[in-house]
């Protein structure tokens, strides 16, 4: 296995083009499946708030900080625990992972994985 050097300071990559691209793609993919959550829990805006935050950050319309990202992510995951159907739970988890992309870009992979599960569960 090849070990890639890891930057010790996130300032070297935070807010870079590719970092924002990961966040934007995660937000777009998660938006596609949020319907499963919002159909079941239309008044619960926690996952939607997470998606809005990461998307606005990726578009350069908003700044984010660790405390805000942590709260948005944990709130979205808590919303997932409150949901009854698998599709709704996976969609909310996808939102929690999407906003986590601000902290660690590879959280986008979690967003894509949960979004895929939401699609499959939504077809049942």
Regions found by a protein language model. Give the residues of each.
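Structured binding/interaction patches within domain cores
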Residues: 2-124
């Amino acid at each position: 296995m090849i070990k890639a050097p890891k930057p010790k300071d996130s300032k070297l990559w935070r807010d870079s083009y590719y970092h924002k691209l990961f966040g934007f793609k995660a937000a777009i993919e998660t938006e596609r499946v949020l319907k499963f959550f919002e159909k079941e829990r239309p008044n619960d805006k926690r996952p939607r708030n997470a998606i809005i935050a990461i998307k606005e950050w990726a578009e350069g319309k908003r700044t984010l900080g660790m405390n805000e990202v942590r709260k948005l992510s944990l709130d979205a995951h808590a919303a997932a625990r409150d949901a009854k159907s698998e599709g709704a739970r996976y969609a909310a988890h996808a939102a929690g992972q999407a906003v986590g992309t601000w902290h660690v870009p590879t959280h986008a992979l979690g967003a894509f994985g949960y979004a895929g599960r939401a699609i499959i569960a939504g077809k049942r």
